[in-house]
């Protein structure tokens, strides 16, 4: 995700980078939950977890990034009580990370070695495109196209 955030021209503090990395590690925490409830259950698990070295805004960022990954980024009703605990900057980054994970997880099927082969590229007019190598083109289908 470091290369992706660079492609998006998003600057990060060391703490934000650490939280982004942690969110990537936690994003599949609710894998056993029913898909209709996975986002909410993951959000609740992370929001109420006892992490060391994570402040309240950081915990909310982690929870929201995972919720946005499962529920979509255009839903403003996700945990309104929690969104008030984070800055607009954290909320924006949670949405971006959640959106990125939402697309990439469909392409990787959570299998190791696939994600490093994908990359985001900035094109004319500021358009961002996900570049999929020819060897992985069969992973691209209707669901990733819709996201």
Label for each model-derived stretch:
Residues 5-120:
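Divalent metal-dependent catalytic cores for phosphoryl transfer on phosphate-bearing substrates
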């Amino acid at each position: 995700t470091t290369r992706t955030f660079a492609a998006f021209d998003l600057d990060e503090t060391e703490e934000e980078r650490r939280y982004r990395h942690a969110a990537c590690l936690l994003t599949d925490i609710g894998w056993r939950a029913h898909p209709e409830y996975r986002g909410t259950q993951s959000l609740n698990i992370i929001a109420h977890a006892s992490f060391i070295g994570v402040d309240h805004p950081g915990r909310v960022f982690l929870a929201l990034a995972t919720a946005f990954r499962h529920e979509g980024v255009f839903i403003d009703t996700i945990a309104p009580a929690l969104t008030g605990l984070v800055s607009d900057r954290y909320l924006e980054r949670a949405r971006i990370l959640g959106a990125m994970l939402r697309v990439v997880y469909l392409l990787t099927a959570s299998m190791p070695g696939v994600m490093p082969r994908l990359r985001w590229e900035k094109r004319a007019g500021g358009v961002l495109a996900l570049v999929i190598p020819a060897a992985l083109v069969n992973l691209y289908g209707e669901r990733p196209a819709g996201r």
